[in-house]
Amino acid sequence: MTNWIERAQDVLQQEADAIIRIKAFINEDFVKSIYLIKESQGRLVVTGIGKSAIIAQKLVATFNSTGTPAIFMHAADAIHGDLGIIQPEDVVLCLSKSGNTPEISVLVPFFKMRGNKLIALVGNTDSYLAKEADFVLDCSVEHEACPNNLAPTSSSTAQLALGDALASCLIEMRGFTSQDFARYHPGGILGKRLYVKVKDLYKFNERPEVAPDTPMDSVILEISGKR
């Protein structure tokens, strides 16, 4: 009988191992990539297809909330009109496990023709994408945590972690502070802690008011009724 606790722990271990493994792949291309993104006068366009597209969307959210303007472009939609999103000064970050999908093969020549710098966050450094990119971030994994070694599990975790490494380095490089973070999150706890005043938290007509000589039982009722 399968021990499902051990199986779940094994999945987590495999994904953790995948992240540890890609530490050794961090090189000068990573450093050049963060400088390229920071110094760009445009935005960071993050693209991918399949599970890579989902990871790309999460990374865009992280970049935007931490001071790096970014937009998501689905690779399949891009080759059917969404390429108009890309402006001359934009940097493209392309996520792909294989680096050889048909959509990527169509997109890359467009990026090169337009002069957009291309960063490949890719699981196959011998792929078309890796060979054509300006900078290559290797996030290859030995196997997926999926029991069939098919569904993106370890590979998507590695993509996410490496993307977070990019974002975190950019945070430090830009000197992005908790106050900056709060400005982008007025609805979050940190934003409220730094910027919301007591007067913002109640409606004027719901403010408890009593006279100096109001009996204590009435004071308690007034406060309790308008919390």
Predicted regions and their residues:
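Short, compositionally biased "basic patch" segments
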Residues: 1-10, 49-57
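Short, basic/glycine-rich phosphate-binding loops at helix/coil junctions
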Residues: 9-14, 59, 63, 192-203
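Terminal peptide-recognition signature
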Residues: 15, 48, 93, 166, ...
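Glycine-rich phosphate-binding loops that contact phosphosugars or nucleotide phosphates
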Residues: 42-171
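Bateman/CBS regulatory modules and CBS-like beta-alpha motifs in cytosolic regions of diverse proteins
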Residues: 192-225
